[in-house]
Amino acid sequence: LPSDATPVLDVTGKELDPRLSYRIISIGRXALGGXVYLGKSP
């Protein structure tokens, strides 16, 4: 579900923007389309 607050991800879930060092982990789904958490990339 694309939104202005969601970075562009590749198929592995890693952000394509090299300036960012965070990955987005989708946790289940909520009424608004899902709960999203930010976590530091390993």
Curated annotation (Swiss-Prot):
SUPFAM superfamilies associated with the record: STI-like
Q: What does the entry state regarding organ or tissue expression? A: Cortex of potato tuber.
Which Gene Ontology MF annotations are present?
serine-type endopeptidase inhibitor activity
Indicate whether Transferase appears among the record's keywords.
no
Q: What are the record keywords, sorted?
A: Protease inhibitor, Serine protease inhibitor
**Keyword Ribonucleoprotein applies:** no
Coiled coil spans: none
Quote the PROSITE patterns the UniProt record gives. Answer: SOYBEAN_KUNITZ
UniProt similarity note: Belongs to the protease inhibitor I3 (leguminous Kunitz-type inhibitor) family.
Functional summary from the UniProt entry: Potent inhibitor of animal pancreatic trypsin (serine protease).
Kindly provide the name given to this protein in its UniProt entry: Serine protease inhibitor 8
Taxonomic classification? Eukaryota, Viridiplantae, Streptophyta, Embryophyta, Tracheophyta
